[in-house]
Amino acid sequence: MKLETKAQGLRGSLRIPGDKSISHRSIMFGSLAKGVTTVRDILRGEDVLSTMQVFRDLGVTIEDDGDVVRIHGVGFDGLKAPQNKLDMGNSGTSIRLISGVLAGQDFDVEMFGDDSLSKRPMDRVTIPLRQMGVEVSGQTDRDLPPLKMHGSKSLKPIYYELPVASAQVKSALIFAALQADGESVIIEKEKTRNHTEDMIQQFGGQLQVEGKEIRISGGQTFTAQEVVVPGDISSAAFWLVAGLVVPNSKIVLKNVGINETRTGIIDVIKNMGGKIKLSDIDQVAKSATITVETSELNGTEIGGDIIPRLIDELPIITLLATQAQGKTVIRDAEELKVKETDRIQVVADALNAMGADIVPTEDGMIITGKTPLHGAEVNTFGDHRIGMMTAIAALLVQDGEVDLQRAEAINTSYPSFFSDLEGLLHG
């Protein structure tokens, strides 16, 4: 796919598609609650559609009229053994969290995914689930998908210190703990996104969170709710960076989720000197309007406890750093290696091919800016965030063409990305 280059400016306002993390969890909690849950502004990207189909395969009736999704919840006890293998597509969120849901189910399941998902290690979930009494096996000693699993109606509670900062692993263990006999304690390495904890309380459940320690009792039931999904800050991130680095730009993003565990990119932009403003802040919905405009930027250091708050935004932050004066150092981000691709290597290769100066490290990157970018051929390797990062980078290219291979990966999280880009180019 040939990408748009030589942008003269991006102007206009956008309403960002629904948050992917919250969309997944809305389907899960709606399915596990009693009654009919309605979800508005859900993201209809491929990952979320995978989760929706899996719960249908587990016996849940889910209606989608294109406006509102209605989930006829069955509770933990109402899930049925699937007739076929469960297809998780490209979605690490789906396979990890649903492993936790199925941990307390006394039936056989097999979960599989696409080529990319089949390379992602699941041992960080399977090891603690085995301790709780689940029979589960995968491929190689890292338990790559497909996973075969048989849950237990007498799950043991667990005391578990997470070896990595991972909201997916934490959430999988929370779903399992909700079905265990007694109280479980989960201790995070670093604070990660807390949508699962928030939604437990929204759906009438209980848990205690003190610092990095989560206590949760089994045997809880949930009640159906009305959910409105805010815009996804991980999708908004591409426009935040575009508005900062493309000359003559001003972009207004409406209804963006600003959950405090997800706003690391806003902190980084401020640290780099970017012009960014939040308005219309809704403390209940945790959303705001965010405005950015073309800025002179300086390099910065990114590491430590901010990393889980921007882990998915690091590819586009790397592009931002190529357009800042001086060095930017990203560290403590080894988790990038086990995303849809090895994002440290793939991001560096893609942007270096376009003229950037990026040195990959064991746990991050060293980026030296400011560098002009030129045309190149870039492959997403099936990673949606690489695709969108490259499309924004292409806007800065003055010399040559940018040819993006496997651009369809973007549909994983942002099916309307290119139409939104067109709107801003002609805004």
Curated annotation (Swiss-Prot):
Name the enzyme's class.
Answer: transferase
Annotated catalytic residues: 312
- Could you tell me which PROSITE patterns the record lists for this protein? EPSP_SYNTHASE_1, EPSP_SYNTHASE_2
Q: Which GO terms describe its biological process?
A: amino acid biosynthetic process; aromatic amino acid family biosynthetic process; chorismate biosynthetic process
Q: Which CDD domains does the record match to this protein?
A: EPSP_synthase (cd01556)
In which residues is 3-phosphoshikimate bound? 20-21, 25, 166, 168, 312, 339
Q: Which cysteines link up through disulfide bonds?
A: none
Under catalytic activity, the entry for this protein gives: 3-phosphoshikimate + phosphoenolpyruvate = 5-O-(1-carboxyvinyl)-3-phosphoshikimate + phosphate
Say which domain of life the source belongs to. Answer: Bacteria
Assembly mode? Monomer.
Q: Which HAMAP family match?
A: EPSP_synth
Q: What is this protein called?
A: 3-phosphoshikimate 1-carboxyvinyltransferase
The upper taxonomy is: Bacteria, Bacillati, Bacillota, Bacilli, Lactobacillales
